[in-house]
Amino acid sequence: MILIADDDFDIASLIKISLEKADLFVSSFADPLVALKEFRSRSTDYDLVVSDIQMPAMNGYEFAQQIKRIKSNVMIILMSAFGFEYCDRSFAGPLQNSDIDAFIEKPIPLIKLRTIELTILNNKNLRYKPNVPLP
């Protein structure tokens, strides 16, 4: 099961619909605090978390850290419209020094997102690092 956290409802809905068309089970939340509460209550159900980086109340890095405290082996993909270089500099390099499995720049070609997510879910030993090119 996949959890999506993005304060942009339209983007979250578009990703959710796309993944559901691939027969994946997806929960989508505009508020990271609500998403965290859901994850906490059903952590064993989730294999993958996709989160925006810049959200109110809690940014994507903080959200990812909380998720990893609950379930350390869950896969996490962060996404942002600002690009990898900007996000890495703005947050003092957390992408390089974290358990984030992948970074995707918005707007996301949905076929690329689906390919990455299916690859990660089908091979949990494969760990994408954000500085490695994604398929």
Q: Which residues fall in each region the model found?
A:
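Alpha4 helix (beta4-alpha4-beta5 surface) of REC/receiver domains from two-component response regulators
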Residues: 62, 83-104, 111, 115
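Short amphipathic alpha-helix used as the core "switch/output" element in two-component signaling
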Residues: 37, 61-73, 93
